[in-house]
Amino acid sequence: EMSFATQEDVFRVGEEVLTATFEKFAPEGAAVTAAPYPVISYKDAMLQFGCDKPDLRNPLRIIDLTEFFQRCTFKPFHKKTVRAIKVHADMSKGFHEKLLKFATSIGMGGLGYLEVEEDGSYKGPIDKFIPEDMKEEMRSLAGLEVGDTIFFIADKEKRAAEYAGQLRTE
């Protein structure tokens, strides 16, 4: 029981109870996350993870490229919320096709992507629609490196977040 408790007081007590519980019941040698636990606003959770209960073990984060694509000449992304997911791995054409099939199965109209080649150039279905003078800006905004693939989700804000969240966990 707590009198005149603030939100911070409740969080602190809750974290103490949870930490003690986890330490008591965790398998021997298992690491327990120390308090304070991360606090993520709903808005930030939807932007970075695409859901309001993110699995923080998944290292992928969603990137907001809406403003960038409003200035770009790629018309299908104009007046839409654009989210992107960057992954670093050598992916086969089959992987792209599997992800595209998943995207259409959840209701997306398609899934654009770009791969960063060894020479720093891009390869992918929307490469020719992004002006050369904007490619370096996109590389900087998304933190792209050689070997990365970036997937694009463009839709209304709520649906873009939901789709990006589902792709992030696929």
Residue ranges of model-derived segments:
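Class II aminoacyl-tRNA synthetase catalytic cores and aaRS-like
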Residues: 1-170
